[in-house]
Amino acid sequence: MGVEDYHVIELVGEGSFGRVYKGRRKYTGQTVAMKFIMKQGKTDKDIHSLRQEIEILRKLKHENIIEMLDSFENAREFCVVTEFAQGELFEILEDDKCLPEEQVQAIAKQLVKALDYLHSNRIIHRDMKPQNILIGAGSVVKLCDFGFARAMSTNTVVLRSIKGTPLYMAPELVKEQPYDRTVDLWSLGVILYELYVGQPPFYTNSVYALIRHIVKDPVKYPDEMSTYFESFLKGLLNKEPHSRLTWPALREHPFVKETQEEVEAREIHTAVVDNKAAWMLKGNGGQQRNEKCDSVTLVEDMSATKGLADVQSDMKSAVKVNSPPTEDFVGFPTQEEIKSSGNPTLDKLENTSRTVKGAQVIGENDKALDLVLLSLERFSKSPDSKRDKDVACSVQSLRIISNLVATRAIVSVGLIEKITCALLDFTDALVGMKSPEFNNIIPKSLSVTKNLVGHVEGNNIHSSYIRHWTKVVEIFIQVVRWEEEGTGRIIYEACSCITTMLSRVAQDLKSSTPDSVSKQILEHANMSRIVDHLCLCLASSGSSLTSGSSQMLAAACEACRAIWILIDTSETFFKNDDVNILPLDALQNRLSQHDIGNSEWGPLSEKLVDTVTRAYLRSKHVQVAVGHCLHQRVEAPLVSAIQLLSRCCLHNGILPSMLCGLPSSLPITTVVSGGEDGTVISEIFSILSYATLSSKDQQTGEKDNFEGRLNNLVFHSCLMLATVAQCLKLTGRNSVLLMLTTSPKKHQHRLSAIANHIASDDKIEASLQNHSASAMLALASILALEKGSSAGSSVSELVVSLIPRATKLCYHLRPMPSNEGEVISHSANYAKWHGLLDGCIGLLESRLKWGGPLAVQQLIASGTPLLLINLLAGKLSNASPEDIKKTSNRIGLSPIGVVWTISSICHCLSGGTTFRQVLVKIETMKLITCLLSDAHIKLVKSWGGPGGGKDGVRETINVIIDLLAFPFVALQSQPGSLSATASVNSGFILNIGSPGVRVCMEDRDLLKAIEEDMDKYIIVLLEVGVPSLILRCLDHLELKDLVRPVAFLAKMVGRPRLAVDLVSKGLLDPNRMKKLLNQSSPREVILDILMIISDLSRMDKAFYKYIGEASVLQPLKEYLTHVDPNIRAKACSALGNMCRHNGYFYSALAEHQIIGLLIDRCADPDKRTQKFACFAIGNAAYHNDTLYEELRRSITQLANVLTTAEEDKTKANAAGALSNLVRNSNKLCEDIVSKGALQTLLRLVADCSTLALNPSKKETASESPLKIALFSLAKMCSNHQICRQFVKSSELFPVIARLKQSPEANIAHYASVIVAKVSGES
């Protein structure tokens, strides 16, 4: 016998093994299950194992084991025919959740008998689970699916290969220890426990947690469980295999031992079944004759219709061809299983449509089809009250059409359109009646419609497609709001029609000549707000799933698919299918934004994404539905859900945090444990673990195809992890704990789950595979959340071991020559918003960051810096804009990849020769600074993916500034430099974490080289136009993002040549200064701008004119009273230096009433502010006496500083200021004396005199304020008699006379001058 001896009725299941159909043995009424297993892709070992399974099954004859009736194979496939059992025990669990103990006991008795039979025949099932237990007629339990079964020889004791379902696996299996037949007994215990309780004894979504529970945790038994039942389960669920209940004691246990009545009933049932089977076999001959006879007289006359003779002739010829038929298909149930409509013509048409040839005959005859459609049209047009009598005929017509569609018997476009219209009208009429009796018909009609609208000849979408679309949308909008039990299948099929049609539209829009109908459909989708209704479908599905029902699960999956296809198609439409050219590629090939098309999303797409994002954020039910789509491990909905969530993350900055389970009100700088179990991020990591385990266990003939599907899951899962991590990073969140939780074990598991999908170091692929590239990207993106190699983080112990070796990473970064010697592009078709090399370069940057100085030196020695420079240069052949569009992502670096590349180069600067190779070479600097050009910045800003937009522009500019600032940081950080010892210095923010800081501590030779080449470097900066580039960058950034650019300006201002260039290029433009000195500016920006003003003022009086024109005095005045003491101090310092060289600003200071505020700062509680205020007062009095009257009030404040200040420099500034107050006139001399300032100066001299006369080796008198105090007294006594008289009469005058003997020359000199002036000596 062969497959030709069976009718194939319908598909009942499928999996990696193949497909299972419901069938019927010809000429009998025997219903069978037919399992088809393809040989393609299977090894000889696999085929041998399949034959072994068949042989095992063939020998088994038991009432509780599915019986194999037949088997055969050809060159392409195996077919195993078994008895047909109606449902799975799994379905009972889904519907009823749990069963009463009496029913569980009845099932247990049958399963025990089945296992007793198997084990007595030395066969281990090895995959006991509810899905492999079927329920046949009379509630007879049938054990099936022996794909993992293994026959043991008489010498076999234990086996070691691991198979089975984790939930039902015994402890010895999960521990990969030897096992025997008792593993089946453990699985039996788990199944019975689940039937009674509602879930297995150990249940969790995490494979690792599940294994831990199975091995270590005790089983908890419900209190209401009977003693016998609990005793039986304890005997089975014993973690020690040798202590489990086994044969023969098992079959004699009171819980499963059969009573005499049960034995007798079983024997009677077996006899009846055997007799029925024999009767069916004996009836073959007669049944065959009847079937042939019926086929010959297939169609009777229909008096009211013309043209049937032609149909009848065709039918008869079809019968001749089909005796016996050699090809069957999946359609509606057989004629024996359905109720006839009473229309003989339709009966015979349906009978003929059941064979492929017969269906083709009907499909080629328009008149026959008109007969079939007539009842559908009549039903659609009749009033509701008259439709009841048309139902049977309409349903029969539907079955006929289903058969025709299943065999693709209808090829005419016109007929397809006609049938589709009729079906949609019929379905719409059924939906409008809102009658539960049609709940089984509507989904069947929609299913057939879906097949029709999905089958469009060629690439053309006909004008009628828009009519079909609008009707499908109308139907979907009606049914999606149905909440009655049993409507889940209807909503699913309606949603599936939407998905199918959108998929066809997407395909059309990607063609070279898209049809206008496709665009009309997108416009209608927008106007009808179909995405809102799809979100409603998700919400309804989530509500149903939350209540414990799974009827809406398929609808949720299909809604996810439909939403994503709609969004993706809208973006394709907006871009007119322009390839997303990466900004770096466009820059290197001199393409403008116009040349590369629009790299943003588009208004319709943004609107759709916004709708979905809002629905997800607001509705817990929508979140539940999408979560179930992820959890199903079915490729299409899972990938759609991942892409949808990834896209929403790019649209809304809240969503990435939400997917990690972070509190919505969490401050950016606060670090908490994210990615805990139950979050979406946790589920994504579980998918990666699932893919790893599945790829190891996969042994079927479809291995290549299965591996491809797993790689696709890995690809999209890793891209989502990367997107979430990058979004968190771009919003300022910096910690891997946000995604990996605070558990070190989870750090290990999750990072390893990603790393497992990166090819091992000993296997370097000729080209980087997409899933491997995305795994690299995910790992790099997560590691980038850590700012530095913190020893306290468990990640630091994992990072270096997980990152591939540098040789492998660098291999993929090298140009790939083609056969003709030209360099070919990286990643022509990788991902829409990522570069193929992003992950590779990101891991290289992580290795440099985490690997320490040794890693840096090794990579430098291997030529990595030059490799990175060449990568940025895009060492590719010149290409036209058209060629670039054909091969997108030529260099393979997205904006984030570019940032990581620059960062990697920056890390290499601390390793010796790289500084001269990169920063002192003008060609290299031109290449790097080109990334700061308006052209590139605009390209990055318009980039729609991660690393684009305003955040991407900020990151791009900042990383290049870090690179350019390296020499400045290195020199400022060396011991003894002013900036190294200052608490707040110019551009200090750039010093934090910079490799330049390490240079002064680790490499004195490099520091010396930088000092030698600094002048050359400054020349290069000027030649490539860095000062003007940085100034233009300020215009591209938001105020909050100006910290690092302004810090770099502050560092450059410290070099005179750069300062001159900056000022000439508009650094001090009034509008710019107004913006930067605004109260809303970041604190660091304000401090650095104040420092810039101060440094320029101190450097050269030529800058006074530009500073004056910059209108900075008003903000300086305001900052004198700022709450931040550092800002007050910087403001005082700037004002002091603005008065350093001359009195240019004196009148302006008076006009803005600044002097009074400066005097108040002399009493500031902040030491630095007090010091710089005294300095500013002194300079305000130095050049002339214009401000003396305003400064009169400062005398008392300065005198107080001399007695209360803690820092000697502050006292020195106060003493110098007092001297300047009498330098230009005697206006303030009397106040100096009367207010005690002169006496305070004398007291200061007296207090410091002891040290001056006897200086120690560690501390000299020149470091005290004594010198300035003596200098001030000398000036006062030289010019003003009142001062001389006061000093001469003071009891402290002898102290000054003694200081003439000081070993410090200046002190002795000033003391001598004072004594001489006071004593009247020349």
UniProtKB/Swiss-Prot annotation:
Effect recorded for residue 132 to A: Alters binding to Kinesin-12 members
GO cellular component assignments: cytoskeleton; phragmoplast
Repeat region (ARM), residues: 1056-1098, 1101-1140, 1143-1182, 1183-1223, 1226-1273, 1281-1320
GO molecular function: ATP binding; kinesin binding; protein serine kinase activity; protein serine/threonine kinase activity
Keywords: ATP-binding, Cytoplasm, Cytoskeleton, Kinase, Nucleotide-binding, Repeat, Serine/threonine-protein kinase, Transferase
Cellular compartments annotated: Cytoplasm, Cytoskeleton, Phragmoplast
Main location: cytoplasm
Domain Protein kinase: from-to ranges: 6-256
E.C. code: 2.7.11.1
Similarity comment text for this entry: Belongs to the protein kinase superfamily. Ser/Thr protein kinase family.
Function text: Plays a role in conventional modes of cytokinesis in meristems and during male gametogenesis but also acts in nonconventional modes of cytokinesis (cellularization) during female gametogenesis. Constitutes a signaling module in association with Kinesin-12 members that is required to support phragmoplast expansion and cell-plate growth in plant cells.
Subunit record text: Interacts with Kinesin-12 members KIN12A/PAKRP1 and KIN12B/PAKRP1L. Interacts with KIN7B/NACK2.
Protein name per Swiss-Prot or TrEMBL: Serine/threonine-protein kinase TIO
Source organism of this protein record: Arabidopsis thaliana
